[in-house]
Structures are given as structure tokens and as C-alpha cells.
From Swiss-Prot:
Identification of the protein by name: DNA-directed RNA polymerase subunit alpha
Catalyzed reaction equations: RNA(n) + a ribonucleoside 5'-triphosphate = RNA(n+1) + diphosphate
Keyword Nucleotidyltransferase: yes
Task performed by this protein: DNA-dependent RNA polymerase catalyzes the transcription of DNA into RNA using the four ribonucleoside triphosphates as substrates.
This protein's GO CC annotations: chloroplast; DNA-directed RNA polymerase complex; mitochondrion
Gene3D superfamilies to which the protein is assigned, alphabetical: 5' to 3' exonuclease, C-terminal subdomain, DNA-directed RNA polymerase, insert domain, RNA polymerase, RBP11-like subunit
Domain notes from UniProt: The N-terminal domain is essential for RNAP assembly and basal transcription, whereas the C-terminal domain is involved in interaction with transcriptional regulators and with upstream promoter elements.
């Protein structure tokens, strides 16, 4: 962290990207500025964002590989230059981009002699390879070579116990960390009581997302982390005691949305992202394509607006309401539905 004195003026708090570049397919760089901040705030924001960027961003990677008739991971396979362990290490380095949730299957099936690269991986439609030239193995003889793979979206470093699997399946220590490094520096500006701070934030990613996307996701995760403090229950009110006392009548979807919009005082709806609502991937993608990112965005739409969204169905309409009933606090629903 660096501190310097620079000239500056007090303005409304704002941020912008001052530098962005692509060093390689697997190395993106971005530099951002946030100002003006009061003394001490830059450290607070910088530390929080750095930790969130390095530990809270989700990434997609290969978590398991299954070979046929391989006794252990240190085995060699006839006609292949690399050992099984070396192939597993190469698969661990493959950088993937996706918005999938849960485990997905992929595979490699080729005939030698030839080099196997990431381009040879057969992936589900929702997953793409960042660098198709990443090496996997070298087949030196005319053999058929197949691997079954598992792909998962997660965060952080996931370690599995090493053991031999009789079916030839081996876990891969997954590194779901799209952000490779984060630095921040603080610059002081102004004089006397008018002194403020400017925060510079540098982000390097592996290409599965841009530094700007990583900054957005880290900020959203921090907002999600603090939201419970904004919705603290009133003293003497127990959610467990009241959660089963309210059953909404069979309103039409439009009436429900209208009533939800009536009173926004109890909760900052623009701070509730649709990611938090656990919508199905289909419904979520429909809303995202329509630039609906928060609960406030959703409640600003009429039923007709939603039905005009490409691929949006009547079933999605019902699913949205059922999800709102499930996730919004009971006292909030009482206020907003005003029965």
C-alpha cells in the first residue's frame, strides 16, 4: 500500500476505470479509482474489496477426471508422453468461463498421434474455454484416448483427499479463483480540514471474467453480506413465531406486484439483486437479458413487460412470485400486500 500527497478537490463520491488492458488470454488487468473518501475510508474499502476479490468470486473449473483401467495417478499410459498425474495437473490449469450452477459433465475423446489441447474438450453449451491452446497431453501412437470430466462452479481452493478409485476416477484440487492478484494504493489530496483520500485499485484476472466484472461481483457480495443488518427485526418480534401466521390470498400476479411496489420504506429494494432470489437459471437469464438486475428493477415492470421478454413464459411468472414469497421477510410482505 502506498500513500502520496496529490492535488484534488472535493466532489461527490464516484469511481471510474482509468486503465484496462489484455496482456494475454489468461491475464487481464484493470486499474480503478474511487474518490473522494474521508481519512481512513480508503483503507476500509481497499481491505474489504481486496479480500472479497480474492476469496468471494466464483469460478468454474474441472474437479474430476475419469480414465479407463488406470490403477493409480502415477501410472503411465502406453502411447502417451505424460503420466496420469501430469495430465491431471494440466487439466487443473484449464480456465473456463460460465454461469452454470451445480456439476456438469464434459469429455475428451481423440485418436493419436496428436497433441491434445483444451480445444479438444467437449463442453456443455453454457461453458466456454478461455484459452483453447492450453496443453493437456501428447499422444505419440495411434491410440484411442478418452477421459470423462466433471465441471463445477465454486469459490476458493477446494482440496479432496487423495485415494485410488477403482473406476479410474480421480479428484482434481479445484482452484476456483478467477482473480489472480489485487493491489491498492491510497493518495491524500487537499489541505487542512479539506483533506481527502483517493483509492486506486489494481485487479488482475485469469480471463474468465474482466477486472470490471470481478469488481462488480465483489461489491455485490459485500452488499449481500451486510444486508441482514439493514433488515434487523424489531425488538420483541420473533420471525420464528410469526412465519406461519400469514398466508397470502390468491391474488393475480399483477395485483401482487402492484401491492409489493406500494411501500418501499422497510427495505432498500435496489440493494436486493435477483441473484439472491434463487431463481431457476432459465428465469434468471430471461430477466438478465432484459436488464433486470435488482428487485426494484423487477417490481418496476408490469406483467405485460415481463411477458414481452424473449423466451419468458407463464410458468416463469408464477415461479417469480413463489420465490418472492419464499425469500422476502414475512413482515415486509404484510406491509406491501396490505391486506
Amino acid at each position: 500500500m502506498v500513500r502520496e500527497e496529490v492535488a484534488g478537490s472535493t466532489q461527490t463520491l464516484q469511481w471510474k476505470c482509468v486503465e484496462s488492458r489484455v496482456d494475454s488470454k489468461r491475464l487481464y488487468y484493470g486499474r480503478f479509482i474511487l474518490s473522494p473518501l474521508r481519512k481512513g475510508q480508503a483503507d476500509t474499502v481497499g481491505i474489504a474489496l481486496r479480500r472479497a476479490l480474492l476469496g468471494e468470486i466464483e469460478g468454474t473449473c474441472i474437479t474430476r477426471a475419469k480414465f479407463g483401467s488406470v490403477p493409480h495417478e502415477y501410472s503411465t499410459i502406453a502411447g502417451i508422453e505424460e503420466s496420469v498425474q501430469e495430465i491431471l495437473l494440466n487439466l487443473k490449469e484449464i480456465v473456463l468461463r460460465s454461469n452454470l450452477y451445480g456439476v456438469r459433465d464434459a469429455s475428451i475423446c481423440v485418436k493419436g498421434p496428436r497433441y491434445i489441447t483444451a480445444q479438444d474438450i467437449i463442453l456443455p453449451p453454457s461453458v466456454e474455454i478461455v484459452d483453447t491452446a492450453q496443453p493437456i497431453a501428447n499422444l505419440t501412437e495411434p491410440i484411442d484416448f478418452c477421459i470423462d470430466l466433471q465441471i463445477k462452479r465454486d469459490r476458493g481452493y477446494q482440496t479432496e483427499l487423495r485415494k485410488n478409485y477403482q473406476d479410474g476416477s480421480y479428484p482434481i484440487d479445484a482452484v476456483s479463483m478467477p482473480v489472480r492478484n489485487v493491489n491498492y494504493s491510497i493518495f491524500s489530496c487537499g489541505n487542512g480540514n479539506e483533506k481527502h483520500e483517493i483509492l486506486f485499485l489494481e485487479i488482475w484476472t485469469n480471463g474468465s471474467l474482466t477486472p470490471k466484472e470481478a469488481l462488480y461481483e465483489a461489491s455485490r457480495n459485500l452488499i449481500d453480506l451486510f444486508l441482514p443488518f439493514l433488515h434487523a427485526e424489531e425488538e420483541g418480534t420473533s420471525f420464528e413465531e410469526n412465519k406461519n401466521r400469514f398466508t397470502p390470498p390468491p391474488f393475480t400476479f399483477q395485483k401482487r406486484l402492484t401491492n409489493l411496489k406500494k411501500n418501499k420504506k422497510g427495505i432498500p429494494l435496489n440493494c436486493i439483486f435477483i441473484d439472491q432470489l434463487e431463481l431457476t437459471s432459465r428465469t434468471y437469464n430471461c430477466l438478465k437479458r432484459a436488464n433486470i438486475h435488482t428487485l426494484l428493477d423487477l417490481l418496476s415492470k408490469t406483467e405485460e413487460d415481463l411477458l414481452r421478454i424473449d423466451s419468458f413464459r407463464m410458468e416463469d411468472r408464477k415461479h417469480i412470485w413463489d420465490t418472492l414469497e419464499k425469500h422476502l421477510p414475512i413482515d415486509l410482505l404484510k406491509n406491501k400486500l396490505s391486506f
